[in-house]
UniProtKB/Swiss-Prot annotation:
Residues 584-613 have a biased composition (Polar residues). InterPro entries: ARM-like (IPR011989), ARM-type_fold (IPR016024), TORTIFOLIA1/SINE1-2 (IPR033337). Keywords: Repeat. One of its GO terms (cellular component) is microtubule. The keyword Repeat applies. Residues 304-325, 357-377, 584-644 are annotated as: Disordered. This is TORTIFOLIA1-like protein 2. It comes from Arabidopsis thaliana (Mouse-ear cress). Residues 367-377 have a biased composition (Basic and acidic residues). Pfam families: TOR1L1_C (PF24713), TOR1L1_N (PF24714).
Length: 820
């Protein structure tokens, strides 16, 4: 029986173990599948959701298995997988914060290893995860701060690594842990601060910006428990402001800003030095540094405390040498240099015998009066000194005032040979020191001293004698005490000179700093001006080279275009002659001695005007302008139409002709054209004298009229090239007809090289002789301008032609006004 029960028990245990292994295997398989989904962008979000769901419903006994899956990720995996494995540790701490305690050390070690990752996304995930662990595990802290030590110790050891990524990541993780911990142990973080300050002062340390942020977190967490530790930490920040690396300077300024933003009272003694350090790098060459420095200055100026620096060691040593009976903290605080409410130093003069109100007191100013103004050779001065103390020279120098009436009193007594001063003994002790030459028990009643002794010792400033101080009147016993005063004046003179020397050194230091700042600003301005000059020279050279290159390219374009158009013109003329010969036409175009050019648009295309030609009956080859205006008045109608739109070339030629004529009349017109051309050529060449009463302009216009009547566009283009622009030799009606045909060619982008000179002449003559010279009608001018502007907006194969049309349109728009 027992044997059977044992066999059954063993079988049950084996079955349970098998089930457990099966569950673990399924969990690992599920996690691995989800991690594989992270490697693909399309399935990344799905994998993240599955992993978070798995962590949320994870059983307590499966935590170890899950951690083994995410901690053993290979470095060859994609950055998304590595980042998500680190982030899942924080997710696990959020859902199961009570279960991850035993595995905390293993998790932190894995995070420290991941700090070497070259991808910044993975390192940022490490910093974020450490913050989550610190915030969630802080509630399980014991008296020995075991959780905090487990989080901090591996990271602090990693700061000493020689890898830059590890140093920076470990410092930032520590800063996040301290910021996320509700109560960081002060003893631990204080020791950390002392170590990190040494690291920050080490010139060979790499990750200084991260350590600066760590020190900032420690100080804000209360790690600077003593004044010396706080001073050393703040000094390290101030030294970092002078670092060559701008990220270090920016981190230091941000740290100073965040510390000053707390507004704690213990920052008061550090206010002056921090403001001075920030002011020195206020004009940093990097803008982010300048912005953070300006913001830090704003916060530090709001910190309670004095902006002036504490007394220097030199000043303190001078004072301590003459005040052995008192402690330095009581005698040489900043309040010693101010006139307190309870302290009153009263002077009485025998000359005025009047009381001066307290509001009228004015201390002597050392640089206001000229010593040469006091011409008295011997003064009788009676001084009453307090029984317990002697008036400090520093108190006299710092007692600024408003005593205009005292100046007037002294002006009335400048001619007196002797001046008497009395010091009234005071019962209350002033906050000033007692010199070694006079004991506290000495009761000085009166002193008679010659003015030469005061000048020799330096105790009495000539500026002091220029003002009279008055108070209560008292009769005192007079005793000569000149010898003791002479012994004491040398000591007082030394103290005065020492104080003035300290002030002078401070002012000189500030002046030197301001001069260096001005010099730096001047250097920056000079460098900027030189850079601007170099940039202008460089840009000018580039523009010149570009202009030369553009001119060469334009010349090349013109040459190629001329060759192409010349070849096209020869081809078009040959085709036109062949077509006309087949149709029985006797009109044949002739090539001029000049280069005849036409557009490539008329290739393999018969002229639309070759089949519809019109002639004009001419009784003579040369007609006067009067007969011309009478005979052509009806036929030369507005070629642009009443609506302001251009007609087709056929309509223009139809309006020019008076009617369709027979083929014989066309031949006759062709013969007339030939005869006129011969006459014009003979007249222009000088072989034949012009006919009496007929000018050369009439010959030119008659030839154009004959060509217009014939309807031969190739002959017209040849004539345009041969004569060139001669609009000044034609009547307004002929000009309108020619311009109408030229504008039709322009809109069709044909014969551009032939018509552009004529359009240029239109602009030039209108500029020279007025807008109404060629086209008196404003309506026709508007129509012509509209057509040219429309053509300027078209696409030209030749950029030079488009520029020429645009320039003509701009000139005419300035002359004739913008076309509506």
């Amino acid at each position: 029986m027992k044997t059977n029960m044992q066999v059954k028990g063993r079988g049950g245990n084996m079955k349970a173990n098998t089930n457990t292994q099966q569950v673990i295997f399924e969990l690992k398989k599920k996690v691995v599948i989800a991690l594989n989904k992270l490697a693909d962008r399309d399935t990344y979000q799905r994998g993240v959701d599955e992993l978070e769901k798995t962590v949320e419903h994870l059983a307590p006994d499966k935590v170890s298995c899950f951690l083994s899956c995410i901690l053993d990720t290979d470095s060859e995996q994609k950055s998304a997988v590595r980042k998500e494995c680190i982030r899942l540790m924080g997710t696990l701490a959020r859902f199961h914060e009570g279960l991850v305690g035993p595995y905390l050390g293993k998790m932190v070690s894995s995070i420290v290893k991941r700090l070497k990752d070259p991808d910044s996304v993975v390192r940022d995930a490490c910093i974020e995860t450490m913050g989550v662990l610190a915030s969630k595990m802080s509630c399980y802290e014991d008296q020995n701060f075991g959780v905090f030590v487990s989080l901090v110790k591996p990271l602090f050891e990693a700061i000493g690594d020689q890898n830059k990524y590890v140093q920076s990541g470990a410092a930032l993780c520590l800063a996040r842990v301290i910021d996320s911990s509700p109560e960081a142990p002060v003893a631990i973080i204080q020791r950390m601060l002392m170590r990190t300050v040494k690291l920050l002062n080490n010139s060979h340390f790499i990750a200084k910006p991260a350590v600066i942020e760590l020190n900032r977190s420690i100080i804000l967490a209360g790690g600077a428990t003593s004044k010396s530790v706080l001073s050393s930490a703040m000094s390290s920040f101030q030294d970092a402001l002078k670092n060559k690396d701008w990220t270090t300077r920016k981190a230091a300024s941000v740290a100073l800003m965040e510390i000053a933003a707390t507004g704690e009272k213990f920052l008061g003694p550090l206010k002056a030095s921090c403001i001075c350090s920030l002011e020195s790098c206020r004009f940093d060459k990097v803008k982010p540094v300048r912005d953070s420095v300006i913001l830090a200055l704003k916060y530090w100026k709001g910190v309670p405390g004095s902006d002036s620096p504490e007394p220097s060691e030199t000043e303190s040593s001078v004072k301590e040498s003459y005040n052995g009976a008192r402690e330095s903290s009581e005698l040489f605080s900043t309040s010693d240099f101010k006139v307190k409410d309870g302290m009153s130093i009263k002077y009485v003069t025998d000359v005025t015998r009047k009381k001066v109100p307290v509001s009228a007191r004015q201390p002597p100013t050392r640089y206001n009066d000229d010593p040469r103004k006091s011409n008295q050779d011997d003064w009788h001065i009676e001084i009453a000194v307090p029984e317990s103390s002697f008036v400090s020279k520093v108190d006299l120098y710092n007692e600024e005032s408003e005593g205009s009436c005292i100046t007037k009193t002294f002006a009335e007594t400048t001619n007196t040979p002797e001046v008497t001063y009395e010091y009234i003994p005071m019962k209350d002790k002033a906050d000033s020191y007692v010199t070694g030459g006079v004991n506290e028990n000495d009761d000085i009643k009166s002193i008679t001293v010659s003015s030469s002794s005061f000048r020799a010792s330096g105790m009495v400033n000539p500026a002091i004698t220029s003002k009279n101080y008055a108070a209560e009147e008292t009769d005192l016993e007079e005793q000569p005490f000149s010898t003791q005063v002479k012994d004491r004046t040398s000591l007082d003179s030394f103290v005065t000179v020492s104080s003035s020397q300290i002030n002078h050194d401070c002012c000189a230091k500030i002046a030197n700093e301001m001069a260096s700042v001005r010099k730096q600003l001047s250097d920056i301005e000079n460098k900027q001006s030189r850079l601007i000059d170099q940039l202008q020279v460089f840009s000018t050279g580039i523009m010149n080279n570009f202009s030369v290159l553009q001119s060469k390219v334009s010349s090349l374009e013109y040459a190629v275009e001329g060759i192409a158009q010349n070849a096209a013109l020869h081809s078009d003329i040959s085709n036109s002659n062949f077509v006309k010969h087949n149709q029985g036409s006797t009109i044949s175009p002739r090539l001029s001695s000049c280069t005849s050019r036409t557009s490539t648009d008329i290739r393999n295309r018969q002229s639309t005007l070759s089949t519809s030609k019109y002639s004009r009956e001419n009784k003579t080859h040369v007609r006067s302008r009067l007969n011309e205006s009478q005979g052509m008045e009806k036929t030369r109608s507005n070629p642009l139409g009443k609506t302001g739109q251009l007609h087709t070339r056929e309509d223009i030629w139809n309006n020019i002709g008076q009617g369709r004529q027979t083929l014989i009349q066309t031949r006759t017109s062709s013969d007339s054209i030939q005869s006129i051309r011969q006459q014009y050529a003979e007249v222009m060449s000088g072989t034949r004298k012009p006919v009496t009463g007929v000018s050369c302009e009439d010959v030119v216009e008659s030839e154009y009229l004959q060509v217009l009547s014939s309807g031969d566009e190739l002959a017209l283009v040849e004539l345009l090239d041969r004569t060139g622009p001669v609009l000044e030799s034609m009547s307004s009606q002929t000009i309108n007809e020619i311009l109408s045909i030229l504008l039709s060619y322009l809109l069709e982008r044909r014969f551009m090289n032939s018509i552009l000179p004529w359009l240029h002449q239109v602009a030039d003559l209108s500029t020279t002789n007025g807008a109404n010279y060629l086209i008196p009608s404003a309506r026709k001018r508007a129509q012509v301008l509209s057509a040219i502007q429309e053509a300027s907006g078209m696409d030209f194969s030749n950029l030079a032609e488009r520029r020429a049309v645009t320039q003509i349109a701009m000139k005419l728009r300035k002359l004739w006004g913008k076309c509506s």
